[in-house]
Amino acid sequence: VKLATDRLITQLHLRVESAKAGHDMKYEQFDFESKVLHHQEHIQRYLDGQHPIPLNIEIDLTNACNHRCSFCVWATYIGEVRATLPLGIVISTLDELKALGTKSINWTGGGEPVLYKGFYEALDYSYQLGLENGLITNFSLIREEHDDQILEQLLWARVSMAGGLREQYREIQGVDDFDKVIANLKRISEKRRVQQSKLTLGIAMLVKPGNLHSVPDMVELASDIGLDYLQLREDMFISPPEKAWWKKQVIPVFNRAEKRAEEIGLKLLGAKYIDTQEYLNLPSKCHAHHFVLGINAEGYVAFCKNTRDNPDFYIGDLRKETFSNIWEESLKKREMESSINPISCATFCKNMGINKAIEDVVQCNITLPLVDPEPPVHVNFL
């Protein structure tokens, strides 16, 4: 218990000292373990058994997608279930979420959010409610007439690009939209500079054997465009052979990329996962759904955002009942809260960072509030 307490307090103090020294954090907005600890009132309500609504909701507006990424974890699901969430359900659910205490919305997929006919209407409605908004997109469908809305109403946009060269991009994403995406990024980046928009704009590159050699090109590209960051990340469902390849082949490339990024002033970020079985054995249960949750394009609310393609994890249907009723009354939710054990989850599950942080607080019987340093960037997105 003492070790866990020391680790928790030290973690918060290190962030304070790092901020004072002006050091960049390696993960920053992708360090979910640190971010969740800044929501101490929410954590306390959860520990008191009040079942607070998730702070961050991921919404799949549609399963339609104009790309065919070879690494897409939802490919089979969105190919078989061509669903689109009715705009009326989106609007009414946003009203509920805001009233109940949700702070932020991830517009994601599923499919490509911008393909959804009512995307900009939904984004505007969410923004006018006072919710923070982020977008995960391939950025190929961004039209100039919507630039000003994007710059004003999105807190961040993360663009999925599978290669720093056209050929690798085409092979992995299944379409030849490389030039189109680059043009959109350059246009938005320049307008952002002129308008002094607070939009954070970056690229996330899932590194695979087929695109590893284009990492240096991606570093140069991201810098030339003027992006805030480049995130290089592994597949959360990485296999044991791929882990060995990662350590032997990828890490040296990353080290060289990091050195080059420092030279040209580009922020190079990783993806912070719990990657050892040791930590999967730690949580007594999964805490994450009280902090982040997923809604799929069929209207199902999933117990875990990573299982929104799996009916076994659906706790309710927004086409039949309200979110608040699902959250308060779902028998499936109660059953899963008592039965789900993280030891059976993937080691690279992003929710494990949240679980680890909350379990530290639970095991140590720590009285909140703890140290409250300057909050990390995009603290409401978990």
Language-model region placement:
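Radical SAM enzyme core and accessory elements
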Residues: V1-H51, E298-Y300, D312-F313, L318-N325, ...
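C-terminal accessory region of radical SAM enzymes
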Residues: H13, A19, E190-K198, K247-L280, ...
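Conserved alpha-helical substructure of the radical SAM core
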Residues: H13-W156, E171, A183, K243-A257, ...
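Short cysteine clusters
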Residues: C65, C69-C72, C286, C304, ...
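Secreted/processed peptides and extracellular or luminal domains of membrane proteins
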Residues: F71, A75-I78, V292, N310, ...
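Conserved C-terminal portion of the radical SAM core fold
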Residues: L100-T108, Y127-I136, L155-M161, D179-I274, ...
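Short, small/polar residue-rich loop motifs at catalytic or cofactor-binding pockets
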Residues: C286-H289, D312
